[in-house]
């Protein structure tokens, strides 16, 4: 269980995997990050266990990184981690969290899809930590976003081929998968939060040689699937 201690109004420190980690406090939600860190093992224990199973010499992609709770956790183990987060407020805090820790993590403000384009992302609000942001769907607020298919970026070596990939993208699973099939197929393991309407992806991953080693209910409409080869 992570241990927490506040060091200032701006930052607080915790401990995970026997490493000290630092996070930025959110002024609009002063207990949000603290509660997320303290609930790491209870909220998504399968995610922490999966991160703990990754060899430290491997590379991880965290797609839909939010403010970097799991990015930093992976970095604390020495795993080279690439974090992708298109929400402007989340990306700002994600970068600050990476900067506050001397871990091998890099962040990119990009959304992955099945095409290369400028698009619109619907967001609940602009507060850091917000989730359930969706590409090209109406929300109360919107902002522009650069989208790209992951396969093309890996093929031209703009990004490395990851060994492992974590995907949490709030209803955008279909278009993401269509643009990332080749890259995913070459991974050792995948943690994919999938809504029920997109569970065809499970069968496709099985056809690529993956086995389901974990299935964890997140709510009535989505599960965390863990796949391995």
Region annotations inferred by a language model:
Residues 59-69, 142-199:
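Active-site segment flanking the S-adenosylmethionine/decSAM binding pocket
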Residues 1-152, 155-157, 201-229:
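S-adenosyl-L-methionine
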Residues 88-91, 116, 173-174, 198:
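A structural helix-start
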Residues 18, 27, 114, 123-125, ...:
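Non-catalytic surface loops within mature trypsin-like serine protease
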Residues 118-120, 177, 202-203:
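Short, well-ordered secondary-structure micro-motifs
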Residues 86, 110, 195:
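Cofactor-binding loop segments of dinucleotide-utilizing enzymes, especially the Rossmann-like FAD-
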Residues 117, 174, 219-223:
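Conserved catalytic loop of SAM-dependent methyltransferase domains
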């Amino acid at each position: 269980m992570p241990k927490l201690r506040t060091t200032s109004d701006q930052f607080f420190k915790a401990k995970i995997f026997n490493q000290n980690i630092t996070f930025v406090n959110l002024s609009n939600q002063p207990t949000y990050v603290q509660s997320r860190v303290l609930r790491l093992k209870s909220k998504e224990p399968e995610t922490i266990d999966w991160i703990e199973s990754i060899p430290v010499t491997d590379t991880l992609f965290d797609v839909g990184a939010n403010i970097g709770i799991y990015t930093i956790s992976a970095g604390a183990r020495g795993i080279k981690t690439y974090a992708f987060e298109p929400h402007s407020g989340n990306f700002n805090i994600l970068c600050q969290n990476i900067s506050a820790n001397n871990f091998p993590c890099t962040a990119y403000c990009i959304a992955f899809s099945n095409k290369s384009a400028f698009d619109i992302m619907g967001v609940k609000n602009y507060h850091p930590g917000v989730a359930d942001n969706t590409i090209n769907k109406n929300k109360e607020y919107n902002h522009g976003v650069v989208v790209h298919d992951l396969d093309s970026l890996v093929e031209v070596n703009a990004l490395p081929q990851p060994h492992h990939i974590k995907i949490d993208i709030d209803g955008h699973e279909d278009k993401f998968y269509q643009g990332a099939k080749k890259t995913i197929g070459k991974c050792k393991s995948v943690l994919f939060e999938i809504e029920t309407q997109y569970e065809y992806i499970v069968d496709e991953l099985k056809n690529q040689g993956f086995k389901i080693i974990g299935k964890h209910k997140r709510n009535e409409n989505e599960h965390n699937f863990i796949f391995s080869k």
